[in-house]
Amino acid sequence: MRHYEIVFMVHPDQSEQVPGMIERYTGSVKEAGGQIHRLEDWGRRQLAYPINKLHKAHYVLMNVEAPQEVIDELETTFRYNDAVLRNVIIRTKHAVTEASPMVKAKDERRASAEVENNDFEDAEE
């Protein structure tokens, strides 16, 4: 089995359906004997340029190890699902399990906000 990185963008009005979509896609990978190495839901993000007059989309990143049949099935599913605006499937040489730069930046912002809150609370006392 080969390793793949999959990113898909979902219509912002369909954001509530994303958890079900993720469950369905990861289920099909696992049923075929594949593995999910990394799964990140980046949430709604601003697009670099409008797609179908939309300026935001819900992003999901998956790193999987799966047979080619599953990848072909996912491609077909993405193609015929109107909620998926764009998708990309890239074959990688090895499994990627570390957090993506998007998640690292988000965690750093969260940590710095907590430090600022603690400093503010200390200043009040």
UniProtKB/Swiss-Prot annotation:
Ranges of Acidic residues composition bias in the record: 116-125
List every stretch annotated Disordered.
99-125
Q: Carries keyword Transmembrane?
A: no
Q: Please indicate if the UniProt record lists Ribonucleoprotein as a keyword.
A: yes
Q: Which GO terms describe its molecular function?
A: small ribosomal subunit rRNA binding; structural constituent of ribosome
Tell me the CDD domains matching this sequence. bS6 (cd00473)
- Key words, A-Z: Ribonucleoprotein, Ribosomal protein, RNA-binding, rRNA-binding
Record's GO cellular component terms: cytosolic small ribosomal subunit
- Spell out the Basic and acidic residues composition-biased ranges: 104-113
Q: Which GO terms describe its biological process?
A: translation
Instruction: Read off the HAMAP family from this record.
Output: Ribosomal_bS6
**Family the entry assigns:** Belongs to the bacterial ribosomal protein bS6 family.
Q: What biological function has been recorded for the protein in this entry? A: Binds together with bS18 to 16S ribosomal RNA.
This one is known as: Small ribosomal subunit protein bS6
**Organism in which the protein naturally occurs:** Mannheimia succiniciproducens (strain KCTC 0769BP / MBEL55E)
